[in-house]
Amino acid sequence: MATKVISVKMTDDKIIAHYMNFVLENEVHPKSIFKFCKEHKIKEDEFYKYFGSFEALQKSIWNKFFLNTTTLLHKNKDYENFSNKDKMLTFFYTMFELLTMNRSYVLFTLSTNRKMLDKMAELKDLRSHIKEFAIELIEESNADKTLKITKQSPRVFSEGAWVQFAFLLKFWMDDSSAGFEKTDLAIEKSVTTIFDVFDNTPLDSLIDFGKFLYKENFA
């Protein structure tokens, strides 16, 4: 009697896992989709079902980081009752916990001698996701305000959130403190500062954040 061969379904997560392992083990990004698929026993049509190129796959990795972060946020039953400031804090804390779990890959892909434009292109979709997340927060806040003059600009706030993430990402990449405790402190101080700026009470937090940056040689 012939033995039935059970085929394992290839998913985007499995392809991403193969890709990240390849990068870490070989310390180089694969250049040929054909060779990559052959080495990992992936049918080319299965690869193209999810990704049109390696560049698209690289963007998808960052999208997964964001999606996994927001999924974890919404699993917390208390999350919806958080203030917008606490939602942003929780988002950054969770995001960087996930990045820490994949730190070797992130450091390699962003620290190699690739052109800056290539690195920014890799983060393009993530930038859109973070800005959309920030827009939702500020629109929730604006909905509770009756005077137009007290409402904040979603566009400005969302761009600020992206700049904040980019700063924290660089800080985290350079952080050598135990458990990346300095990154946690930077998250807390930067989120406090940006929300105080939008509440028009920025002076104390700006001074505090400036002292922190000076101490860490980032000023």
Which functions belong to the PLM regions below?
Residues 2, 10-35, 39-45, 59-63:
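Short, amphipathic alpha-helix enriched in basic
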Residues 120-144, 155-167:
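Amphipathic alpha-helical packing segments from all-alpha helical-bundle domains
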Residues 152-171, 185-193:
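Hydrophobic alpha-helical segments that form the core
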Residues 174-219:
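C-terminal peripheral helix-coil segments that are non-catalytic and often amphipathic
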